[in-house]
């Protein structure tokens, strides 16, 4: 009991986990304290009385027995140098004002006309020859070649598919005459 009065933090050591204490402290524990760690079912009803008897020490008593860490002291004045431990936040540069982009109509001073480049040039001779279907030998040829069907295939369109652009393909055998629509 006398050892408990000298060290006010022994209250926490008695009920703390075994991993937090050192092996030297575990060797010095009296049998009473070890029996106190394991709660007996008979004493569990009277546990409230035991807690009332064991109270934490007051702050004055606690700080008389506990030593303060050395890094808090200024060796010349033997007082805590709080200014040395103050950490200041880094200063942020002033933010530049940026105009929000929104859907409102901008003032007339800020109007700018968008300059669109001309579309890629189209050879008008090719366009006119396509319009008037003047595709003779002397007509200018378009750089893009039309994709032709492979030999032996021709497209068939049914009456139902005249409106649609899809068409059916069927293979034509070399000896078979081509069928015409009725």
Curated annotation (Swiss-Prot):
GO terms for cellular component: nucleoplasm. Keywords: Phosphoprotein. InterPro entries: DUF4660. One of its GO terms (molecular function) is RNA binding. The modification Phosphothreonine is found at residue 67. Residues 1-67, 100-182 are annotated as: Disordered. Residues 23-32, 151-162 have a biased composition (Acidic residues). Expressed in all tissues tested including heart, placenta, liver, skeletal muscle, kidney and pancreas. Weak expression in brain and lung. The keyword Phosphoprotein applies. Transmembrane segments: none annotated. It comes from the Eukaryota. Residues 50-63, 172-182 have a biased composition (Basic and acidic residues). Pfam families: DUF4660. The modification Phosphotyrosine is found at residue 132. The modification Phosphoserine is found at residue 158. The keyword DNA-binding does not apply. Belongs to the UPF0690 family. This is UPF0690 protein C1orf52. The gene is C1orf52.
